[in-house]
Amino acid sequence: CKGYYPRVAHNKMGGRVARLLVFPLITALEKTIGKSDYLEFMKSFKYPLAGEFSFRRNVLPELRISSDWGIEVGVLSEMQRNFSPHNICQVDLADSYDHKHQELSIKDDTKGLSRMSIDIIKTIIRKLATQGNSFSTETFRSLKATYYRSALDLIDIYRSDAQMNGLKFDSHNEE
């Protein structure tokens, strides 16, 4: 089972990496390289980056578990590769949970959300490459443009979600 809890703290939305990186990246990948069972599987999770998992003992030897920030998507990738999607679920753990927040770290890509984002992207791209997808310079160029458009579209949706739920939302900060 994969844990889930809402990412709302201090009257604003959290979960920036999932909202602003993973979900628009998956959308952009589908538009750029086409739909796949893997991308559909990843989209099926409300929050694919929650690190709380529980496993049956016999499952663990079948999983290659990474030691970087790509661990959550890596574990999901391994579950999708080795087991039927019907063998995993996502469970609401709490109404709220205060987890460790990372700094944005724009100037240092070895720290914080920059490092986390790089590790997550590498994990997803490697998984797709092992399935026979190739990523040329042109593919990455197209992916980048498609990702940016997808992220901007989602920001509009998040703005509406925040407004409907009485949460603060800073569009400039999100972009």
Residue ranges and their predicted role:
Residues 28-69, 82:
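Aromatic-glycine-rich donor-binding/catalytic loop that engages nucleotide-sugar donors
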Residues 67, 77-96:
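Catalytic donor-sugar/metal-binding loop of nucleotide-sugar-dependent glycosyltransferases
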Residues 103-175:
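Terminal low-complexity segments of carbohydrate-biosynthetic enzymes
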Residues 20, 58, 74-78:
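Active-site phosphate/pyrophosphate-handling residues
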Residues 22-27:
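Conserved Class I S-adenosyl-L-methionine
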Residues 89-110:
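Active-site donor/metal-binding and catalytic loop motifs
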Residues 1-16:
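Short beta-strand-to-loop element that shapes/binds the nucleotide-sugar donor at the catalytic cleft/hinge
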Residues 6-10, 60-61, 96-99:
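A short, flexible beta-alpha/helix-coil linker loop
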